[in-house]
Swiss-Prot record:
SUPFAM superfamilies: Winged helix' DNA-binding domain. Its main location: cytoplasm. Residues 437-449 have a biased composition (Basic and acidic residues). It comes from the Eukaryota. Component of the eukaryotic translation initiation factor 3 (eIF-3) complex, which is involved in protein synthesis of a specialized repertoire of mRNAs and, together with other initiation factors, stimulates binding of mRNA and methionyl-tRNAi to the 40S ribosome. The eIF-3 complex specifically targets and initiates translation of a subset of mRNAs involved in cell proliferation. It holds the Pfam family PCI. GO terms for cellular component: eukaryotic 43S preinitiation complex; eukaryotic 48S preinitiation complex; eukaryotic translation initiation factor 3 complex; eukaryotic translation initiation factor 3 complex, eIF3e; nucleus. This is Eukaryotic translation initiation factor 3 subunit E. Residues 432-463 are annotated as: Disordered.
């Protein structure tokens, strides 16, 4: 499945530490030569201060340049002690319960800064030392300590630019520490910061596009670890919003794989009672058709086969390849069974809408099921009230009879209005973007091939 591996497209938009798990996954599934992967892992890790981890891969590389790892350890230890000493005045304060209570009751950062100056003789430089110490902890791979230090820095610091950097660092720390609820909150905070830049460096359209591209990639870790309900639904809501859908189409069309996969995986997931159901599959079919010239793979092509071309024979063959792609994908591998199950459900829905009489044996064959499995599948299919059809099984003829109720004018009007509302939002966003900075002809396609320019700096926590 190396032909469909997205790792090389994803890594330029990730911090080095976030990219390490992707390469470890490739090592586990062995779709690339071991020597090549060891070299890639070494090149990635040597930009960090995780000396023992770097040494591990250095030993696996033939004819590697000699490296004095003992000296690197001594330098890392000395740097750690230096930064720890500079940050110590602030760390003492945040470890003091009485001081923390006073800071929490302060109400805002200006009052807290006055309190720190007057009672603890702490200035801005010492607060910034907390950021640099947290950043260094991150580079050492101590993500728990890094996240804690950056959390307190965000509470105390008045520096908008450093706060943005700390937000990225805290998100990465939460991800690598497996704190998914905290990471989701950080994704929302960063999204708010990026979408409302307030005259900062993010106010420039290109910087905002780059930041949104990073956030889309980093958020994959969060959404696909929150499950098919909260995670996939959250991904769909964010990725299909006009600003972020425009970003995907402009700079990272390969993320369409995860959009389509999330829509299929969560197709039958229970929705909260207060959330209106939205047919993402129909929207995505239009998007996949539009962006086919930029990106296509077996997962996106499967959706097009079913809902655009109605080529169910091709869809059946494509599903087999798509399943292999899903099982080898870092983010999707845990949802392989749900993907296949719901993909079969989509094929069944289309068949039931196209035909009034369906041969159960033929349907089972189309779904790659035995006759017995096919009969059980069809029983479950009939029970699903969201199919929008009534069905009965004729056991004598081994046929499924479909009755379709006609849609009411009101339902048709509502569905049409929803589509118009979504397209209007997309047009409005496109017009606003055009007013902000006109695009040159061909810019969209060029950016799509230059994702590597969005790579975070290697020695910094923040992107």
């Amino acid at each position: 499945m190396a032909d469909y591996d997205l790792t090389q497209k994803l890594i330029p938009h990730l911090d080095r530490h976030l990219a390490i798990p992707l390469l470890n996954h490739l090592s586990d599934i062995a779709i690339y030569p071991a020597e090549q992967l060891a070299r890639a892992q070494y090149d990635l890790a040597k930009g960090t201060n995780m000396v023992n981890y770097v040494e591990q891969f250095h030993a696996q590389i033939e004819n590697a340049e000699p490296t004095d790892f003992a000296r690197l350890r001594d330098e890392a230890t000395a740097k750690y002690q230096e930064l720890q000493e500079k940050a110590q005045p602030v760390t003492k304060v945040i470890e003091d319960p009485d001081a923390v209570a006073k800071l929490r009751s302060g109400g805002d950062k200006d009052r807290n800064l006055d309190l720190l100056r007057s009672e603890y003789q702490i200035d801005i430089d010492q607060i910034n030392a907390l950021y640099h110490f947290g950043q260094y902890q991150y580079s050492l791979g101590d993500y728990g300590s890094a996240g804690n230090l950056l959390y307190h820095f965000l509470i105390l610091s008045p520096s908008y630019e450093l706060n943005i950097s700390a937000q990225w660092g805290k998100l990465a720390s939460n991800i690598l520490n497996g704190e998914w609820d905290a990471a989701l909150m950080q994704v929302r905070d960063l999204r708010e910061t990026i979408d409302n830049p307030h005259g900062t460096s993010l106010a420039k359209p290109l910087a905002q596009l780059q930041a949104r591209t990073w956030l889309l990639h980093w958020s994959l870790f969060v959404f696909f670890n929150l499950g098919e309900n909260q995670g996939c639904q959250g991904l769909l809501d964010m990725f299909l919003s006009p600003a972020y859908l425009n970003t995907i189409q402009t700079s990272c069309p390969h993320l369409l794989r995860y959009l389509v996969a999330a829509a299929i995986i969560s197709r039958r997931a229970p929705k909260p009672a207060n959330v209106r159901s939205r047919d993402h599959v129909k929207e995505l079919t239009r998007i996949v058709e539009t962006e086919e010239y930029q990106y296509t793979d077996p997962i996106t092509s499967f959706l097009k086969d079913v809902f655009a071309d109605f080529d169910l024979t091709q869809a059946q063959q494509r599903l087999s390849v798509a399943e292999s792609v899903v099982r080898s994908d870092f983010f999707l591998s845990g949802f392989a069974d749900e993907f296949v199950e719901n993909a079969r459900w989509l094929i069944s829905e289309v068949i039931c809408r196209l035909h009034r009489r369906i041969d159960i044996g033929q349907l089972s064959k189309t779904l790659n099921l035995s006759n017995e499995e096919g009969e059980k599948w069809i029983v479950n299919l009939i029970r699903d009230s969201r199919m929008g059809v009534e069905a009965k099984i004729d056991l004598k003829e081994n046929m499924l009879h479909i009755t379709r109720p006609h849609a009411t004018p009101t339902a048709t009007l509502i569905e049409t209005t929803r589509g118009l509302a979504f397209r209007s939002q997309a047009i409005q966003f496109a017009m606003q973007s055009s007013v902000g900075e006109p695009r040159e002809r061909g810019e969209r396609g060029e950016r799509g091939n230059k994702g590597g320019r969005g790579r975070p700096r290697t020695q910094e926590v923040a992107a």
